[in-house]
Each structure stands twice: as structure tokens, then as C-alpha cells.
């Protein structure tokens, strides 16, 4: 979300309208509980959605109790409550009668459809545990892989609303094994798995799943703009400087998704250009906006910490020793905080170095980035190989010029990797 979106209620409404019914309600209530200036607007938005598109009178009543300050001149809609109570009872009885009749007649497809209708009813009412149990009973009446894929997606969606992300991944595993029969579900399945991994703090797995989501995906729970934010933050936290540059150069999906959020795109470019203070400052400026995303907010502190840690490791690569003062200037961070971060990184064995608290310096051992030294070694060996080849070719050319009919002293060169060691 951009700052303008949060200040302008019309923009906020447009943002919320991109989601499905329950996501609209849950996101609006999350904002209401975390932003006092937007509380009244978001509560009334959620109430409107509840009354128009659901039968969840329990949530409706509880919101009047929780947000009493937003309803000073409003009363509980008793007429709506009575109407919903009546129709809920009527609909539930009818759905159960139909299901029982189909089971007595052993009509398999009709049983499946009736069980789906019952599960959908529980979801509309907001009884997600009952909806989950009803959807689970549909499995035995599915007759093909496509039906199983659609069912698994519904189970994933309900599990997200409940907040059971381990179940999302379990149902996602089943969905991925049957998705070939319903290819249109591929992006939502990977998006839900990515969201579950993200909420569980497994950012690398989240990144891997999000990268398989098509850029034109639009779903009731997570939008392509959300994925752009999550994928960019995960990349900043998980990928080092070298990997990030490679992905931006070669990965079309990552480029397309990260382009959807200009602010985070600037953060990615800042990291590529080693402008770490710009990266961290930009993230901090957007922190308030991110804190109003119900899935991002709980991960924000950990993500920012990992991004800062990854940036610090990338920053230290060229150095053998460095004063805290220079790091503090380049990162716009207090020296004491720098020292604390360095000690944590070294204790976690992510950096092979030592901290001199008296001199306020950090000393980095070469082995802290062994892959870089392996790259340097390979480059040196390759350079030596080409040098030997060039020398022998030059020698052969000179030998040819100095002889008339004789064969060259060196007719061919056969340089191997072993020569580069000599």
C-alpha cells in the first residue's frame, strides 16, 4: 500500500475492493484495529460487507461491542439480525435435507454437489471450522483429478481464513499433484502456498512459490500487488548482492512482479548499486504502510532485520577491517547498533570475523565468504590458461616465420587444466 492510499479513503476503498468478501472484511478490520484515523471508515466498510454479502450475525454483533466509539448515533440493526437468523435456519435445514436425500439415493455426483453447497453455506455464515469439515467430506465423492484440485484450493482458502498455514501447505501439496487436470488453478495454488510459507517465516520457500505465479493473477485473498511487495521483501532478505543482480538480469517473472511496486523496485536497484542507506531508509519510510497489511505486519520486524543483516554481509565482502564509524555513515545506523548487529552475525557463524569494542572496528577473515575466493581462484586459473595459450601461439608464429620449409617446432597446443597449476 502506498502512503496516499492510506490517507485517502476513496483510495483505501478501491484497494479493499480488489479482494473477495472475507478478505475485504478481515483486512478492513485489521486496519481498523491498527490505525485510529481510519478506524471508523474501515469498521463501517466491514459492516456494510457483512450485511450485504454474508450471514455472519455473530461477527456483526461483536463489532458493535468492540467499536462502540464508531457507532455513537447508530443502533444494532435488529430487523437484519432477525431476518438472517430465520433464513440461516431455513437454508441449513434445506441443505441437510437435500444431502440426506442424495445419500439415500446413492447419487454420487449429487452428493458431492450437495456437500459442496453445505460447505459453502458454512463459509458464508463465517463458521469456517464447520466449512472445513464439510469440504473434507467431499473428497470421497470426487471422481477425477480436476475435482480434487478444485476441492484442495477451497480447503487452502478456508485454512488461510482460519490462520492454519500448516494445513494450507498440506492441502497445497495435494493440489499441486492434481493441478495438471485444472491448469487454471496453478497460480492461485502457488500464491496460497507462498502466502502460507511467508506467514510461517520461511521466506525462501515463499519466494520460490511466488515466482511461479503469473503476473496477471488476481485472487480474492491475495492480489498481484501483494505478491509484488512480498516477493521484493523476500528477495532483499534472502538473496545476496550477486544473486539479486543475476535474477534481475535473467528472471522475467521476478522482473515483472517486482515492477508492480515502484518503491520496492527502487530498493532492489539500491541494493544492486550497493546504496544500502537508501535501501534501508526507503524501507523505513514505507514501514507504516506495510504495518497495515494483515499478513505482512507480523513479519515486518524479522524481515527488516534479515534485510539489514544481508546488506551488512554484502557490504563487508571487499574489506578485511573496517571502523564502525564508516559502517554507521554508509547505513545511517547508530554505531552501538552496528556493533550489536555484528556480534549477532558473528555468533551465528554467518560472518567469520572479530569485533574490537575498544577500537570500534570489525576484522573480517577471508574464509567468511569462501565462494568469493573460489570465484577468484577460478578466474586466476582461467587467466593463466589463456596466458599460456597466447604464449605458445606467439612462439609458434615466430617459429614459422624463421623457417622456410621446415615444419613449425610447435604444430599445435594442447593446454589442459593441469597446465594451469604448473
From Swiss-Prot:
Protein name: COP9 signalosome complex subunit 1
Coiled coil spans: none
GO terms under cellular component: COP9 signalosome; cytosol; nucleus
Signal peptide: none
Keyword terms, alphabetized: Cytoplasm, Nucleus, Signalosome
Location (main, coarse): cytoplasm
Subcellular location(s) per record: Cytoplasm; Nucleus
Family the entry assigns: Belongs to the CSN1 family.
Native source species: Schizosaccharomyces pombe (strain 972 / ATCC 24843) (Fission yeast)
Quaternary structure, from the entry: Component of the COP9 signalosome (CSN) complex composed of at least csn1, csn2, csn4 and csn5 subunits.
Known function: Component of the COP9 signalosome (CSN) complex that acts as an regulator of the ubiquitin (Ubl) conjugation pathway by mediating the deneddylation of the cullin subunit of SCF-type E3 ubiquitin-protein ligase complexes. Required, indirectly, for activation of ribonucleotide reductase through the degradation of the protein spd1, thereby supplying deoxyribonucleotides for DNA replication and repair.
GO BP annotation list: DNA damage response; protein deneddylation
SUPFAM superfamilies in the cross-refs: TPR-like, Winged helix' DNA-binding domain
Domain PCI: 202-369
